[in-house]
Structure formats: C-alpha cells, structure tokens
Curated annotation (Swiss-Prot):
Family under the similarity heading: Belongs to the bacterial ribosomal protein bL34 family.
Organism: Sinorhizobium fredii (strain NBRC 101917 / NGR234)
Any one Gene Ontology cellular component term annotated for this protein: ribosome
BP GO annotations: translation
InterPro entries xref list: Ribosomal_bL34, Ribosomal_bL34_CS
Region (Disordered): 1-44
Descriptive protein name: Large ribosomal subunit protein bL34
C-alpha cells in the first residue's frame, strides 16, 4: 500500500508557503493569527 505522505519541497511551498497564504483572504487571516500568537515561523 502506498503511504499518504510523499514529501515534495515544491508542493509543500506551493500549498503551504507564504505566497500561497497571502493569495487568499483566509490565508491572510491565518498569517495574522500566527503573528498575533507570536509564532516564530509563519508558514512553510
């Protein structure tokens, strides 16, 4: 059986990266929440 997690740096950046987050309203809310919480890393 094939495992569900097949790591790829490119896909990770495209799906969860900073620019992907900034491109949607919801993503911007995610970043705002992580900033408010004081997260060191905002995105992948």
């Amino acid at each position: 059986m094939k495992r569900t997690y097949q790591p790829s740096k490119l896909v990770r950046k495209r799906r969860h990266g900073f620019r992907a987050r900034m491109s949607t309203k919801g993503g911007q809310k995610v970043l705002a929440a992580r900033r408010a919480r004081g997260r060191k890393r905002l995105s992948a």
